[in-house]
Amino acid sequence: MDMMKKRKLDENGNGLNTNGGGTIGPTRLSPQDARKIIERFTTDQLLDLLQEAIVRHPDVLESVRLTADSDISQRKLFIRGLAADTTTEGLRSLFSSYGDLEEAIVILDKVTGKSKGYGFVTFMHVDGALLALKEPSKKIDGRVTVTQLAASGNQGTGSQIADISMRKIYVANVPFDMPADRLLNHFMAYGDVEEGPLGFDKVTGKSRGFALFVYKTAEGAQAALADPVKVIDGKHLNCKLAVDGKKGGKPGMPQAQDGGSGHGHVHGEGMGMVRPAGPYGAAGGISAYGGYSGGPPAHHMNSTHSSMGVGSAGYGGHYGGYGGPGGTGVYGGLGGGYGGPGTGSGQYRMPPSSMPGGGGYPESGHYGLSSSAGYPGQHHQAVGTSPVPRVPHGGMYPNGPPNY
């Protein structure tokens, strides 16, 4: 090339900052220049570009985290269906495989020191929670548990309610000494289990004589019911759709009390009477399987101990349990739960102003059976009696309905 022509090209800015292929390198572009290039892109086009950049470039992922992690509701998970002997350390060990944890806790019974059947996990980054939710059903200590966003609460649609009713089965005559994992291994042969077995005593960890399983598909439940009588270790177990229990009209669901607790309270997944106030109390009452009434609570988030920090519709009725007369479901109930105004202690208690009164949980729900349902071979509560002491209105649960 003539030297005079080359000098003129250089003076006009050509031939500078090339990447070897004759094109101008990106270092000459300012952020404003880049914005002008993409500002006419559609949302889908921008998402396509950004998702590839997040996966390929760690610095882009960190930038996205700075914005996404500010919403704790997308990082906090609720895990239900835990065994009585599941510990915080075990929960942390499992979920830390998905990402760095800010907090993990199994909620314990203050009397027995054992798991109440649920816990919370908060990830440091939203992508850790996202990975953990890819498979919501996780086998932990012989149980298939369910993981969900804590903020999602009880927000099932009508179609979801109908769908669950066709996937949930009730198993009667379960031997008291049959381990949960033995029962689970048998029923997993019919299809993928979403949750179960439910119904084991929270204190002893033993069967109460029945169990519940929720399959991921209705076909799995139907396969399990093709032969309604199962023989496991020489014992005959009777199976049916759990929803059928609402049609029988037989009085008296089983009302088994805590084995050896000596407190007269009914604990555990299946039996769902009012539970004693505990250290995780909230003004609206967190019913037996936890739950948030109303909108997000206005409590402080100053510490990492914020497992109860995201409010929503609650874990109440959607998985309501076997509420007998005056009883509340195990996954929720009328104002039942861990304390009302002035009750509870410890770092997880919410201020009374953070939640509306009145509880807000139906007596039973998609995982529950009506108080009129009856199954053979179970312990029945005598009509007109209750293992739970009645408290005058305005007593233990001043915001709840009468007799709570």
From Swiss-Prot:
It is found in: Nucleus. Disulfide bonds: none annotated. Plants over-expressing UB2A1 display severe growth defects consisting of premature cell death and chlorosis. It holds the Pfam family RRM_1. This is UBP1-associated protein 2C. It comes from the Eukaryota. GO terms for cellular component: nucleolus; nucleus. Residues 1-29, 246-270, 344-404 are annotated as: Disordered. Induction: By wounding. One of its GO terms (biological process) is cell death. InterPro entries: Nucleotide-bd_a/b_plait_sf (IPR012677), RBD_domain_sf (IPR035979), RNA-binding_reg (IPR050886), RRM2_NsCP33-like (IPR048289), RRM_dom (IPR000504). PROSITE patterns: RRM (PS50102). Its main location: nucleus. Residues 75-152, 167-248 form the RRM domain. GO terms for molecular function: mRNA binding. Expressed in root apical and lateral meristems, young leaves and embryos. Signal peptide: none annotated. Keywords: Nucleus, Repeat, RNA-binding. Heterogeneous nuclear ribonucleoprotein (hnRNP)-like protein that acts as a component of a complex regulating the turnover of mRNAs in the nucleus. Binds with high affinity to RNA molecules that contain U-rich sequences in 3'-UTRs. May function in complex with UBP1 and contribute to the stabilization of mRNAs in the nucleus.
